[in-house]
């Protein structure tokens, strides 16, 4: 089995359905003998360019280990899900379990917000 990193972008109106989508994709991988090494919900972020007249979308990153059949099934699910605006699947050499640079940035932003709120409260 090979390791893959999958990033998909979900329509912002469907953001509340993202946890269910993640669970469905995780169950697809695990039911066929694969493993999910990392799941990151990056949240709503600004798009680099407009997609379907949208400026923001919900980003999700998955690091998985699976076979070709499972990957083909996932790709089919992404293509025919109207809520998924774009997806990218990249083969990696090893399993990535550490937080991605994007998650480190999100954590840093949240820490700044928390510090600002405690400063205002004081």
UniProtKB/Swiss-Prot annotation:
Matching InterPro entries: Ribosomal_bS6 (IPR000529), Ribosomal_bS6_sf (IPR035980), Ribosomal_S6_plastid/chlpt (IPR020814), Transl_elong_EF1B/ribsomal_bS6 (IPR014717)
Keywords: Ribonucleoprotein, Ribosomal protein, RNA-binding, rRNA-binding
SUPFAM superfamilies, A to Z: Ribosomal protein S6 (SSF54995)
Stretch list, region Disordered: 99-122
Annotated signal peptide: none
Function: Binds together with bS18 to 16S ribosomal RNA.
Name by which UniProt lists this protein: Small ribosomal subunit protein bS6
Organism: Ralstonia pickettii (strain 12J)
Gene responsible for this protein: rpsF
